[in-house]
A protein has these predicted regions:
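Bacterial N-terminal signal peptides
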Residues: 8-17
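Bacterial N-terminal signal peptides that target proteins for export
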Residues: 1-7
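A composition-driven signal for long, intrinsically disordered, charge-rich low-complexity tracts
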Residues: 4, 20-21
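Flexible, solvent-exposed loop/hinge segments and secondary-structure transition points
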Residues: 21-144, 148-152, 158-159
Length: 159
């Protein structure tokens, strides 16, 4: 009986630790989002620096790491942007040249529907935009019909 308890405890400690924390202290749900922004990355740093950011790395055959870019939560870089239903939190990836590799909408309370910021075409509009270029809603990014406040907030928090 004591052996059974010990095995259950060991299984919980070993198996459960992977549920709570992913690579280098990064939560698995965040790690999944980072991999969507940098599919070629083999590792990611924990949040560090000022402003707080993750660094995406690729490793070559010898194991040498090369930085691919950075990812940051918009709420940790710019003042809190509020949409129609509240804050909009996005994870933004930037390559080493200052070009957006992608965005992942994290948390929001905006209305859902055919023209939601959760739709893949919303995030796709930001990909390959250079952060040094002017950026305007309606020109660089299409607005979501009937969601002016949501879109304005999303664009301001990314740019």
């Amino acid at each position: 009986m004591a052996l059974k308890r010990l095995l259950i405890l060991a299984a919980l400690l070993v198996g459960g630790s992977g549920l709570a924390v992913g690579q280098a202290g990064i939560e698995p749900s965040v790690l999944d989002k980072l991999k969507r922004l940098f599919p070629a990355a083999t590792t990611f740093s924990p949040k560090e620096g000022e402003p707080l950011h993750f660094t995406a790395y690729a490793a070559d055959a010898r194991g040498a790491r090369t930085a691919l870019g950075y990812a940051f939560w918009t709420t940790e870089v710019v003042p809190l942007e509020r949409g129609y239903g509240g804050p909009i939190v996005m994870l933004v990836g930037l390559d080493m040249k200052g070009v957006i590799s992608g965005i992942v909408v994290g948390d929001h309370r905006e209305p859902y529907g055919n023209f939601s910021i959760d739709m893949p075409q919303f995030a796709a509009q930001f990909r390959n935009k250079d952060i040094r270029d002017p950026f305007k809603l309606g020109e660089d990014v299409d607005a979501v019909s009937r969601a002016t406040i949501t879109m304005s907030s999303a664009v301001r928090s990314t740019w």
